[in-house]
Amino acid sequence: MDNVQFEQGCTLFFSIMENVQLILSPLEAHNAEQRYRVVKRSIDARQRELKVLLTILVDEKGHKVEREAPIPLYEPPHFQDVHHAERTAIIIGAGPAGLFAALTLLEHGIRPIVYERGKEVSARKVDIARLNRNLGLNPESNYCFGEGGAGTFSDGKLFSRSKKRGNMQRVMELFHYFGAKDNVLYEAHAHIGSDKLPSIIRAMRECIIAHGGEIHFETCVDKSLFHNLSTPSLRGAGESHPPIILSIGHSAHDTYRMLLEEGVALEPKGFAMGVRVEHPQSLINQLMYHNQPQEVIDLVGNASYSLVTQVQGRGVYSFCMCPGGHIVPAGSSAESCVVNGMSASHRNSPYANSGMVVEIRPEDVRAEAYMYGSGIDTLEFQEWLEHEAFLHGGTDNQAPAQRLRDFVEGRLSRDLPACSYLPGVVSSRLDEWLPAHIGLRLQQGFRDFERKYPGFLTNEAVILGVESRSSSAVRIPRAPETLQSVSTPNLYPCGEGAGYAGGITSSALDGINAALKIAEKYNL
């Protein structure tokens, strides 16, 4: 079937199909998922009896469409061969923004040339395994840097709170096209898992190269690239420098400083920092699922949560909650301690962890600038607190830790519960050394969450410091109409590192939008 026939078939198919929403018990929903074509699925745990909301596809006669019906799930992408394309674009960073930008450029006949400072995903897995075994940090290949970006080994959640414009469903479809399971197309909180995402990222890379794009690993760009980009002669009507999509991720602090030196506009932005809290997953299941029996939990999966409160004019909230997950060392430089969370696809570890972070505005950290140096206040503050966590932890990436109730009540934990963080933990008074505008708000936030879910504030739980990379502390401002840097024409900052996204899906969407602007500029 050619593209025209496919598109006509899709149009006809979707014009005669409708959706019907069902409210089912977990067992009924499980059986329906095995038989029918599901469009959307979510869990309603507000009442004691869990309900699953399923949206099912039905035909023009009102009959439910069978799961295995030979009908298209979506229109597949149409990548062009760009081996000899005249139009090119440079992409810096092979995270979700960079990879989805590259795929979008292929769809428009533009040849992407991608530079990634880290390693390809298989070699990166080796470096991460060494890090988890206390065998050393590779500053260019870790949980932050390498093929797929930070999201590759931090859970693979495919949902976003972002309300930005764009085809978020198309992001899900591309993940599915490259190997994700069907449920990414309809789960309200879709999740791939850190064990499955690497093969999907690898498939994207192979597609880009097969169609004529380039990906260069272990390659850091230098300032000459940006110097040439901003040379006045290259702004005219003659031969111009290829456009650059800047998708560096939120941890490329050295690149931020290089950009500043080259006159690219950067500014501090609001972000969030705090700790990662870990409970027994069985306790979270009890609290969120109202003591449901294990056979019900087996049907719906381990419970997650999303918590938010306001303390002294700032948000305190959960971030990147990982049911059945692990806490991992997510730093990218020596003498710093950064933690994050991840879950494998089955989410079956005995632990539940989540970032618990406090909203930080630029004005919140300027008063303390004398403590951590000069520069971009928010960036310097972030680095300073990560170093403080290192000083209060132990050697070999051990993290400072405190039982949750001890933290809230202000005392040293004499011992610590079992924890999923492989490098190990050291008992520490986080309540004393965290800055007051973070620590005090966290303490009150945990009290608020205890009122909502009695039993949440328990010494069975442990907190680790610091959770500092939930979002970028810097923004690279861009023009809303063109998505180009306000200071540097032909430079397209995008994704988390530019301060315009937070997470895999919103970063991917931002990369798509940047690529579309380049295609528009090329009149393609």
Language-model features, listed with the residues they occupy:
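Residues forming the flavin
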Residues: 6-153, 157-524
